[in-house]
Amino acid sequence: MAIYRLAELLETRFRRSFLKRAWIAKTPRAVLARPDSFMNVCGPVVARLAKSFGQPLVVHDDLDLPLGALRFRMKGSAGGHNGVASVIAHLGTPDFPRLKIGIGRPASKADVVDWVLTRCEGADRETFNGAVGRAAEALRSALDTGLDRAMTELGT
């Protein structure tokens, strides 16, 4: 969702690339891409995109961050995130930047899959939507001023 909000801010639109198996929006400053696959198995598509366009900055949800929190990281482990593990496996390295959007954890461990796949409602939805907007602004800042400065501005 943050990548779509960023596309709006940059006044560009996504187009489907069957060759790359992704939705792609090109701008003078960056190529935005959303793999046309489930997050858990997006690694092959991200690796293909990286070969064409350079190192990715991956945006993903994070159970270990409170709902609405944002955090840039320059590299790191998958932290239990299957989609990030897929990207690491197919890029062959954990050394790529990422922006994590906190979704918090459910009350019960058994509910994790449903928690990740279900839309939040009410006040949680407002908090999440606010985080998506802030994430898009942070990504635009990274394009405008560089990732290091955007990380400082975000406080991560």
Predicted regions and their residues:
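Nucleotide and nucleotide-moiety/phosphate-recognizing core
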Residues: M1-K75, A85-L99, P106-D111, E126-G155
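Short glycine-enriched, charge-decorated loop/helix-capping segments at active-site entrances
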Residues: R71-A78, V116-C120
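Hydrophobic alpha-helical segments within soluble ligand-binding/sensing domains
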Residues: G80-G83
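Active-site oxyanion-binding pockets that recognize sulfate/phosphate
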Residues: E121-R125
